[in-house]
Amino acid sequence: MNYNEAMQYIESLGKFGIHLGMERITGLVELLDHPERKIRTIHITGTNGKGSVASYLSHILTASGKKTACYTSPHFVKYNERMSIDGVDISDEDFAAVTEETKAAVDTFLKNGGEQPTQFEVITAMAFLYFAKEKVDYAVIEVGMGGLWDSTNVIVPELSVITNVTLEHTDRLGKTIEAIAEQKAGIIKDHVPVVTAADGSALEVIRVTSEEKSAPLYVYGEDFSATLLAGSMQEQLFLYPFHSGEREVTIHLAGAHQIVNAAVALKAAEVLAKKDPAITEKKILKGMDLT
């Protein structure tokens, strides 16, 4: 299969639409020998800020000397943009190769009586396969929609991140903040730490789920924070309370919400650093500056 053939196949899957659920992706990754279990992952959901937090974390991990993959959606120009390693999009050749292997698994799944996987499910499986083949140290995985029934939720990550929760996709996720928060909180796994900037009733849903799962919870405004020092259209300077003391952090994105996103990424990196000594305060700050 060449790249053009791969693209024709991927685009042909668009007609199957969006169908939330775990049965298809579970069957697909099983046929691919569970590539998602061969990589360490960070799972990110939330109404806004997923992309920013994913970018910050990816740069931090790369700056820490880790081979770091990132899976995001949607793309701007090419599907290749959805899966990258250390900031480099998957090549056309590798894209075609993982498409061919994943298509073979889809064909087997269908022959065995399975339901046709959606485009997003197939691309998600492709990303897991590519990252496993490349033996990445970490993969930052962004949820497509919601969380609980999203195809990315087959992973058991090192860390779960829920940026925030507001009304979105009410036709699929629910018509209240609480209902949508339940979908977002669906990524929380047993004993896996959670970092969030959610507040109000959404936070309470996340807090209850975290307690039920015995998952340590870190909340913006309670367990960590950020204080703006100076800002312009080009960059912002704020104070962040590391364990060793407050440090000045510069980001190159405007808007108060970006400071919150940056703080979430910083806390996420600190949590990961508890198990990975290569992720130091110096490397974290370097990664933030490179974002």
Regions found by a protein language model. Give the residues of each.
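ATP-dependent carboxylate-amine ligase catalytic core
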Residues: 22, 26-30, 34-37, 63-155, ...
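Buried hydrophobic packing segments
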Residues: 57, 61, 127-131, 262-272
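N-terminal leader/targeting and accessory segments in enzymes
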Residues: 1-48, 52-67, 76-78, 104, ...
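Acidic, Mg2+-coordinating active-site environments of NTP-dependent enzymes
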Residues: 110-111, 115, 135-142, 157-248, ...
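A generic structural signal for residues located within well-ordered alpha-helices
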Residues: 20, 52, 120-123, 183, ...
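Histidine-centered active-site/metal-ligand motif
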Residues: 43, 75, 169-170, 257
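Short glycine/threonine-rich catalytic loop with a Thr-x-Gly-x-Asp
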Residues: 68, 233, 253-266, 291
